[in-house]
């Protein structure tokens, strides 16, 4: 039930015999339901980031300092992975415990940045806490049994904080972060904003990406329902004097509680972006897409500078003619019992540098939507590849780099006895896939237990 108690009880009462070099402790895991706490206990990772926990278990002794070692047998590993996959670290009860622990340490109400600074649970677990509690302020009010209105917070303030909670904390790219920072601090020079952001970026921040960020902050990009949920607020405007906050944004910032909450969210986003910047040198592609990092379809639309959020219509792939990009999304282990033969595509890695992929059915090499890929040498269509092993991993995909077309040929796929047209592509991967990740993707799970999971560093 507790990572601390697990460590206290591990090998309790045992001592190294005089003259022996080491002591071996064999622990039989009985409580499978909570064994996601084992990597937290043994390796001291309190972030509760699922990818971090999987990586730690896979790496074994690599994550332990000093002369100690740790080994898990295969069944134990599988059960720990299964618990990590199935456990929600966004349940209010769990988050309340983490909040109370931090509150006790600090002797005051913790900010999001306190979790970042104290090497505790990742503040991203609170961004948002749950689908029902959509900002950290609302989480605290619910925990402390107070109402936001007691702090002068209106529904408009809450809608705005929910918007920024979704947009900023993960630090996916710097543009929105530096634009909002400038508005709060009274910096109106767009050139100086761009210069500061570029100094802290591993890729070129081009005009299209700045236009995309400004559009998002001017109530663009999002779907109509999303805009309404977030209050239909435009935050920035451009004029002869450069960048400035809109009147609506100025009015929101007059409330000190709102301003403090926004600054806290912004600080987390800048800190997360800085961490990404430091660890991703040499792995960052255009749009701040980092090889082996994970993104949702919505993230991809944003980072590829699409005008609108097209996440619900991408499915396996989609050509955006405005940006000349065609991201491909692959679920490697498909649920064959619940999909038709016409969508059971046999996409696969032939080796670390070659990927075989199939278009939608009822397509040929003459289909308009495929011309950018078929004639990529002249079209210059960018084709980022996103892969996840199974639907059990959630909605995020590993970005594995961009694809370059080697060949495209007409083929067939069978569905209920019918032969349907399809196009088979072979792509060269601009970044060879990590060998451990490739082995993981190619390993078929046994029963309901997932196999070894490796998230490359």
Question: Which positions does each model-derived feature cover?
Answer:
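C-terminal accessory/interaction regions of large nucleic acid-associated machines
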Residues: 149-311, 321-326, 344-345, 349-351
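Short, surface-exposed beta-strand/loop "edge" segments at domain boundaries and coil↔beta transitions
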Residues: 105-108, 185-194, 333-344, 392-395, ...
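Compact mixed alphabeta submodule
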Residues: 390-456
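Long, largely alpha-helical accessory region at the distal end of helicase-like NTP-driven motors
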Residues: 38-178, 454-457
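Acidic, glycine-rich low-complexity segments with interspersed aromatic residues
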Residues: 160, 182, 287-396
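A short, structural micro-pattern
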Residues: 19-22, 379, 397, 419-421
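Structured loops at beta-to-helix junctions and adjacent beta-edge loops in soluble globular domains
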Residues: 28-31, 331-333, 388, 428-430
């Amino acid at each position: 039930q507790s990572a601390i108690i697990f460590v206290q009880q591990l090998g309790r009462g045992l001592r190294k015999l005089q003259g022996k070099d080491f002591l071996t402790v064999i622990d039989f895991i009985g409580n499978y339901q909570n064994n996601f706490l084992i990597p937290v206990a043994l390796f001291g990772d309190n972030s509760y980031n699922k990818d971090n926990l999987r990586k730690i278990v896979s790496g074994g002794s690599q994550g332990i300092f000093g002369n100690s070692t740790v080994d898990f047998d295969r069944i134990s590993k599988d059960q720990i992975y299964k618990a990590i996959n199935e456990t929600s670290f966004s349940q209010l009860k769990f988050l309340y415990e983490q909040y109370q622990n931090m509150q006790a340490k600090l002797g005051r109400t913790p900010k999001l940045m306190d979790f970042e600074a104290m090497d505790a649970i990742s503040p991203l677990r609170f961004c948002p806490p749950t689908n029902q509690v959509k900002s950290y302020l609302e989480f605290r009010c619910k925990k402390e049994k107070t109402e936001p209105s007691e702090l002068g917070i209106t529904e408009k303030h809450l809608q705005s904080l929910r918007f920024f909670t979704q947009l900023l904390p993960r630090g996916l790219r710097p543009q929105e972060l530096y634009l909002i920072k400038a508005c709060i601090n009274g910096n109106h020079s767009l050139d100086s904003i761009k210069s500061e952001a570029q100094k802290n970026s591993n890729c070129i921040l081009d005009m299209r990406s700045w236009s995309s960020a400004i559009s998002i902050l001017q109530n663009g990009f999002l779907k109509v329902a999303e805009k309404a949920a977030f209050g239909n607020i435009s935050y920035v405007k451009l004029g002869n004097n450069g960048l400035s906050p809109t009147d609506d944004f100025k009015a929101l910032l007059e409330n000190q509680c709102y301003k403090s909450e926004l600054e806290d969210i912004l600080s987390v986003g800048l800190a997360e972006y800085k961490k990404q910047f430091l660890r991703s040198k040499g792995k960052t592609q255009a749009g701040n897409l980092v090889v082996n990092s994970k993104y949702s379809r919505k993230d991809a639309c944003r980072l590829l500078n699409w005008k609108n959020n097209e996440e619900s219509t991408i499915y396996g792939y989609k050509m955006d003619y405005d940006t000349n990009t065609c991201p491909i999304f692959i679920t490697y282990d498909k649920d064959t019992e619940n999909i038709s033969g016409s969508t059971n595509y046999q996409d696969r890695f032939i080796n670390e540098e070659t990927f075989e992929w199939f278009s939608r059915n009822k397509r040929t090499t003459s289909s308009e939507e495929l011309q950018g890929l078929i004639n990529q040498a002249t079209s210059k269509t960018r084709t980022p590849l996103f892969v996840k092993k199974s639907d059990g991993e959630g909605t995020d995909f590993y970005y594995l780099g961009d694809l370059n077309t080697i060949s495209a040929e007409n083929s067939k796929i069978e569905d209920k006895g019918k032969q349907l047209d399809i196009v088979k592509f072979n792509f060269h991967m601009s970044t060879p896939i990590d060998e451990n990740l490739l082995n993981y993707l190619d390993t078929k799970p046994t029963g309901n237990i997932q196999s070894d999971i490796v998230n490359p560093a």
